[in-house]
Amino acid sequence: CIRDRHNLTGLEFAYGIPGTVGGAIYMNAGAYDGEIKNVITSANSVRADGTVHTTEANKMALSYRSSCYQKNGEVITSGVFRLEAGAYDDIQDKMVELMGRRRSKQPLEYPSAGSTFKRPEGQFAGKLIEDCGLRGYTVGGAQVSEKHCGFVINKDQATASDVMNLMNQVSCLLYTSPSPRDR
């Protein structure tokens, strides 16, 4: 943990987000007013022809849950981040605060890939899913979380196919719902 060895601050928002550095860059992971785009300076990736490429942050087209890597097919192998020196206790306090918020709102008692659905601008995916009556909706072993509808959890030995089918069904149901909300 960079906090323990170097007292570096800037990635506290990512504490508790499941995944890898490459995945975080790929989707511009973020939570609680922090995003990868705020701290990354560059990333290395491998192209389809096997060449290694370095991309500077300003060329990554980072936006809400999006990056250039979603279109170019490159595999991210590492990232360079701009972090600042901080006080250990302040960093620890922020991480504890954010994890407390996660525990109170997110279904951490079940395996999941974290927040599953991309939020429409100005709205919350979990609220839209709840409004469509999909809390607890299940496909195979995958379920829309009862605790937070923005999460798909592995309730009972879900397969990848269960999770993908559930995500697709929820998306289709949201777009065909007679809800008065703009889609």
Identify the residue ranges that each predicted region occupies:
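Conserved small/polar residues in nucleotide/adenosyl-binding loops
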Residues: 1-4, 175-182
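Short, well-ordered alpha-helical segments in soluble proteins
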Residues: 3, 21, 25, 29, ...
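N-terminal glycine-rich flavin-associated loop
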Residues: 3-8, 35-54
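Anion-binding (especially nucleotide phosphate/pyrophosphate-binding) glycine-rich loop
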Residues: 3-21
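Gly/Ser/Thr-rich beta-alpha loop segments that engage phosphate groups in nucleotides
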Residues: 16-25, 32, 116, 152
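Active-site glycine-rich loop that binds ribose-phosphate moieties when present
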Residues: 24-31, 38-41, 54-66
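Short Gly/Pro-enriched turn/cap motifs at secondary-structure boundaries
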Residues: 33-34, 107
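Phosphate/pyrophosphate- and phosphate-bearing ligand-binding catalytic cores of soluble enzymes
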Residues: 46-165, 172-173, 177
